[in-house]
């Protein structure tokens, strides 16, 4: 598995990218690799151990998860209302699931 974050090549239309089977957020289990997709409903910049971190909340019809990218204040193309798919291994953070530095794919608007 590559440690690099996946981005779509500039010459490949996003709509042509095939995603693996996405799991509904409500069915996502901690410590199991999954793909989830939904709409960005909240974005905050929050420092973690003195480093910048971007946190976004992603919601589908079944629930909400949080994704945090450490060392980032923003990610190009990630805006409120944008559809996004993320993949990674979520962990429980308090009472909700959180992905740390997940891979992501921006979906058509």
Label each region the model flagged.
Residues 1-37, 41-49, 92, 97-109:
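OB/S1-fold single-stranded nucleic-acid-binding modules
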Residues 29, 72-87:
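Short nucleic-acid-contacting surface segments enriched for D/E, G, S/T with interspersed K/R
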Residues 37-41, 57-59, 87-89:
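Residue-level recognition of well-ordered beta-strand positions that form the cores
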Residues 34-36, 54, 84:
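Hydrophobic core residues within well-ordered beta-strands of beta-rich domains
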Residues 63-65, 72-74, 91:
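A short acidic, glycine/proline-enriched capping/turn motif at secondary-structure boundaries
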Residues 43, 47-67:
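OB-fold (S1/OB) nucleic-acid-binding surfaces
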Residues 68-69, 101:
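Residue-level recognition of conserved beta-strand positions in structured domain cores
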């Amino acid at each position: 598995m590559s440690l690099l974050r996946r981005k779509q090549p500039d010459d490949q239309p996003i709509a042509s990218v095939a995603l693996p089977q996405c799991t509904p957020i409500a069915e996502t289990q901690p410590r199991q690799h999954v793909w989830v997709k939904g709409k960005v409903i909240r974005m905050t910049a929050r420092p973690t151990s003195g480093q910048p971190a971007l946190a976004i909340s992603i919601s589908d019809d079944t629930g909400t998860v949080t994704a945090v990218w450490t060392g980032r204040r923003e990610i190009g193309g990630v805006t409120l209302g944008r559809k996004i798919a993320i993949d990674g291994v979520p962990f429980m953070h308090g009472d909700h699931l959180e992905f740390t530095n997940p891979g992501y794919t921006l979906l058509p608007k």
